[in-house]
Amino acid sequence: MDLLCSLTDGERQTGIERIYLDVKFLRRERESKTLTSGKFTPANALLILVDGENSGEVFRAPIDGYQGSTFKQLSINDNMNTDYMLQIINMHRQTLRENKVGSAIPHLNKKLFKAIEVPIPPYKEQQRIVKAINIAFKHLDTIMESL
């Protein structure tokens, strides 16, 4: 995983009013708050939760804003299909949640995150895998609705 993606902070900005991209806003549990300084996150950037109980959960920034304090920006190598990588991360989410570090506030175990082994099929195969996963989830949704 270490060679395929990176966890970074956005560039620090001041004097520009932007939405604060915290977990409650991204989950639509709260209205937006604005700040005049913070770590810039462009719209559509991926944010991974690195602090708290749900470490490893990934969000897509809906608009330009300032990165929440419990996030890192997740950058995926251009040679990898983003949805494929997100499926790999999601597949390991429970392991990441169960192996957090820190006592007072649990944190994403970045060493474990970087050590995730990722099969690297050709790009077209990554796309095919994502399509197959999406179809399987649609079938599961249909089954769940019929229960």
Provide a role label for each language-model segment.
Residues 90-93, 97:
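Short amphipathic alpha-helical signal-transduction/dimerization elements
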Residues 1-10, 17-26, 119-147:
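Non-catalytic DNA-recognition/assembly elements of restriction-modification systems
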Residues 24-29, 37-90:
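A short beta-sheet element
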Residues 65-72, 102-123:
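A short glycine-rich beta-alpha junction/loop motif
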Residues 34-35, 102:
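Short, solvent-exposed loop/turn positions at domain surfaces
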Residues 85, 93, 126-129:
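Interdomain signal-transducing alpha-helices
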